[in-house]
Amino acid sequence: MSERLKGNILVTGTNRGIGLELVKQLAEKTGEESHIYACCREPEGVRAEALRDLATQYPGKITIIKLDTSDEDSISGAVRAVSKQIGAAGLNLLINNAAINKPALPGSLAATGKKDMMEVYETNVAGPFLLVKMFLPLLQRAAERDTPEKDKGDKMSCRRSAIINISTLISSIEKCPETFHMAQMYPYRTSKAALNMLTRCQAEEFKTHNILVTSIHPGWVRTEMGGEEAPLTTQDSVVGMLSVMSSLSNKDSGMLLDWQGNMIPW
């Protein structure tokens, strides 16, 4: 279903894991009219080698952007770089994927300090907040352009103008009694709960602009953060998420869904 996604798409945290796979599948499954802006902290670093290799496979389709989501100046620089290329078309889809987790699993109360809480919050919540705030003019520009969706009852879509915040099942307050035994992860789960509120607030604020805002749980994925015991590959998770993104509409804005499209309670 990801072939339904198109336009200018920006993804954060793309040097590895889910972010890298998002860029890969978007490059494979979107048309020539699409362009992917792949953001990471150190585009020239060793950890971004796979991303650089991917960009060379799709010349003119992928642009790597230097971005540290915990640094406001870095975000401003990324906005300027993307704006120069996008022009009047605007930004159709912003995927806030970059996130960190501290301390190491299981992230118990005893092992967690104030510094851990603040660093995780800065990247996982303040970062997406600032990204949306600074990229909003480009998102609005895309939303205001004439598109086939504009004349339909469902005016919102990821093809028009949308923000996707990558969240997690363990952000759910209602599900906490079921998930707490899996991993306590105090900083991570509380930061993602805050990200969910950010999703809900922005969905309310931006609905008059026809900008969709949805949180998506990618599943328990076999990544550096998810660990080797995770049942899902990045490929399967991203296939599912892109299918969900391609079908989102007004009714899904402000919601928390999983990679298969199932609703998760707050």
Regions found by a protein language model. Give the residues of each.
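Conserved glycine-rich Rossmann-like NAD(P)H-binding loop of the short-chain dehydrogenase/reductase
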Residues: 27-48
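The beta1-alpha1 cofactor-binding region of Rossmann-like NAD(H)/NADP(H)-dependent oxidoreductases
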Residues: 45, 67-80
